[in-house]
Curated annotation (Swiss-Prot):
Protein name, per record: Sec-independent protein translocase protein TatB
GO terms for biological process, alphabetical: protein transport by the Tat complex
Gene: tatB
Topological type in the membrane: Single-pass membrane protein
GO cellular component: TAT protein transport complex
Keyword Calcium assigned: no
Ranges that cross the membrane: 1-21
One Pfam family named in its UniProt record: TatA_B_E
Amino acid sequence: MIDIGLSKMALIGAVALIVIGPEKLPRVARTVGTLLGKAQRYVADVKAEVNRSMELDELRKMKDTVETAARDVHHSFQTHASEFQKDWESGTSDAAATGHDGILDPAALEGPSSRIVPTYKHPGKNWRLKRSATPQWYKARAGVRTKAQSGAARVARFRPRKFQ
């Protein structure tokens, strides 16, 4: 911002002390500091706004390129779809002209592509059955709680009995 060294600051302070006087100098210094802070904040806000506008311009350019790419893909897809539709219609019209009804003979179905592939079915294990299959002696050794008990009931159960 402004390049002011220590000697220049001392000179400015001495001149201000002589011109303004010792009584008004602290108030003037506070006012100058406040105004300088406001100026710095204003400059920072302007910089941020310029950066934001530059980023928005870049984003708009990116958006335009993405939109043009999407339009190109959509156009190519439409052309391929229309070509496929024309080929399909010509193929079905040829089949209708030859008298082929579209039903294949069983001999044509034989081959590797006609095999039925079974689908995977998850076994659907029941977690209750798994837990009950664990032996009780193992649960006792491992410290697995089989009965739920509240905290107060547990304290009452393990509290030493009073002597009478």
